[in-house]
A protein has these predicted regions:
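Conserved AMP-binding/adenylate-forming core of the ANL superfamily
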Residues: 13, 33-101, 105-109, 126-131
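Active-site charged/polar residues at nucleotide-handling catalytic sites that mediate phosphoryl
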Residues: 135-137
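Structured binding elements
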Residues: 115
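Short beta->alpha connector loops at strand-helix junctions that form conserved
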Residues: 121-122
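Short, contiguous pre-domain boundary segments
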Residues: 1-7
Length: 137
């Protein structure tokens, strides 16, 4: 996916969306990039991405997590490297089935950084819907 930059010295320049992430990580490394907020519940999810160090549950109430641009980019890079290490290459399709959460975008960008195609599925889909959509992807 390519976007047109708006404003500043980059006006009119076309660059991949992953380059925006890398640019923001360089220019605004310590500024907040993503916020996850749910004031009514604590983090009780169990997810399989923990082995890659992408999940960092908190015990704060109200529940709020945030990550900076540099952390966002680092997590996307780590996930991309994991995928490449498992044989994912440009043009491959990678399904993403997970809850809406702070880790969703670093994982999505990690897929894009490999050159693969991200295929997000709604986590509410049943197995038949997942199979049907996977066949269409």
């Amino acid at each position: 996916m390519k976007l047109h930059a708006v404003g500043g010295s980059r006006e009119g320049i076309i660059m991949p969306v992953t380059e925006y992430l890398e640019r923001n990580a360089r220019e605004y490394p310590d500024e907040v990039a993503l916020v996850e907020l749910n004031p009514d519940e604590k983090d009780t999810r169990r997810m399989t991405w923990k082995e890659f160090g992408l999940i960092e549950p908190t015990t704060y109430s109200p529940y709020r997590r945030e990550i900076t641009w540099s952390v966002f980019n680092e997590k996307a890079n780590r996930f991309a490297n994991m995928l490449i290490g498992r044989g994912i290459k440009k043009g491959d399709k990678v399904a993403i089935i997970m809850y809406n959460c702070l880790e969703w975008l670093p994982i999505y960008f990690g897929v894009l950084k490999t050159g693969a195609i991200a295929v997000p599925f709604n986590f509410r889909y049943d197995s038949d819907e997942i199979y049907y959509c996977a066949e269409l992807a």
